[in-house]
């Protein structure tokens, strides 16, 4: 973590339709080039379209949604995939699954969030659940992006990312 290049961060959840999409878009929005965020899932949505409510709250927050899609985490284990510096699971199911081998053995962390797509109720209630998840993710990412990443070793990056799970 000692050069000036941006760090690649991969966010994982089961379907890559809500939480990991929110995290990818938010980190790319707030990082000012310090990070390049990606997202994927173990069982992505077949139509490759993120949850419409996830896209709606991102747009409402002024975060770009261009290029967001649900995709398999397998594409990030391929030899020509971007090298990841950090892989973060954002749902408990993905955290418990056997992940692919990530080239370069990136640092890992788990930041669990409740699945907003499982909230029952009116569209307004569901949309509020997505907004609250976005707020939680952004709060943690604001702390993450303020870390002195250039001076962190891989182990220190991993420890710092894991400590943020408690925030």
Task: Tell where the protein language model's regions lie, with residue ranges.
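Conserved active-site segments centered on acidic
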Residues: 2-78
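Short glycine-rich anion-binding loops that position phosphate/pyrophosphate groups of nucleotides
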Residues: 17, 92-95
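Short, charged/polar "capping" segments at the starts of alpha-helices
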Residues: 47-48, 95-97
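Alpha-helix C-terminal capping/helix-to-coil transition sites in glycosyltransferase folds
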Residues: 82-83
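Short, Asp-centered acidic motifs that coordinate Mg2+ and/or phosphate
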Residues: 86
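Redox-cofactor binding/interface segments in oxidoreductases and associated redox assembly factors
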Residues: 89-90, 110
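Phosphate-binding/catalytic loops
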Residues: 98-167
